[in-house]
A protein has these predicted regions:
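Acidic (Asp/Glu)-rich catalytic clusters
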Residues: 7-11, 41, 65-78, 113-117, ...
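Active-site groove signature of glycoside hydrolases
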Residues: 113-132
Length: 271
């Protein structure tokens, strides 16, 4: 397994185990622990969470069934989580919205730590830009969270270059990661300055949905069909699975991107 060193105290595996489907996959606590152990055997020590995954249930299951049952695993893994998205009904709201004021981020951080059964996460990301938010307030929250040791490092997710640089200008600590969509089908971040800005600042890039959300495998739109034909040819020539080619597309980029997997199946993870 290859790793990305983002600071003197943060090194993440280039393959990150995404935990968005922890609950939806219908696996038991024992199966989840088996999955975590298999990840570690493969060198995958980084796990991606968010409060909105299963409306908190995914973090809760990971905390209850992994870290409470086997506390020693905490020192072997890196936990990434996020904050800043309010789901419908959480605060009397009908629609999802993004909110990154100081008090909201502090409360979300505490709630995630409680669900995950840990006293800190290794990396906290602002999940989505809050276009009506005050970046100074967001920065104050991140500084306090790091100062209190609740998150060892911070970053963002889905930030445009100007949004990234604006928030960074209010911080005395670096934003170490920008998590973004990157795949053979979703290449827009190569052309809008997001990837270039990350490389300029030596910011880690964590690619979500590197398999295109599955649409390349089954989609009937022209782009999906064309990509599927080309990827199948390459996969056959190389003697590998098509998803391996899709991961390779992201991993070969000079930015040394990380990819977030979506499977909870240890066998698929190995492939």
């Amino acid at each position: 397994m290859q790793y990305v060193t983002l600071s003197d105290s943060l090194r993440l595996s280039r393959v990150v185990a995404g935990c968005m489907r922890t609950v939806g996959a219908g696996i038991s606590g024992e199966e989840l622990r088996t999955f975590v152990h298999r990840c570690l055997e493969l060198g995958i020590d980084s796990f991606d969470h968010a409060p909105v995954y299963g409306a908190g249930a995914c973090e809760q299951m990971f905390g209850d069934e992994v870290l409470k049952v086997e506390p020693s695993l905490r020192d072997q893994i890196k936990i990434v989580t996020k904050a800043g998205i309010i789901l419908p009904g959480q605060r009397g709201n009908r629609h999802i919205y993004y909110a990154s004021p100081k008090e909201n981020l502090l409360k979300e951080m505490d709630a995630s730590l409680k669900r995950l059964s840990t006293d800190h996460v290794d990396l906290l990301l602002i999940h989505r830009p809050d276009v009506l938010g005050d970046p100074e307030q967001t920065a104050m929250a991140l500084e306090q969270i790091v100062r209190e040791g609740k998150a060892l490092h911070v970053g963002v997710s889905n930030y445009e270059p100007s949004q990234f640089e604006t928030l960074q200008s209010y911080l005395s600590i670096p934003l170490l990661v920008n998590q973004m969509e990157v795949s053979v089908k979703a290449t827009y971040n190569f052309f809008n300055g997001v990837v270039d800005t990350a490389m300029k600042h030596k910011t880690g890039i964590m690619a979500w949905s590197p398999l295109g959300g599955g649409s390349v495998f089954a989609g009937q739109d022209e782009q999906s069909v064309r990509l599927r034909e080309t990827l199948s040819e390459i996969a056959e020539a190389k003697g590998v699975a098509m998803d391996t080619v899709m991961y390779a597309f992201v991993l070969r980029h000079p930015a040394k991107m990380m990819v977030i997997t979506g499977t909870m199946n240890p066998q698929r993870l190995q492939n």
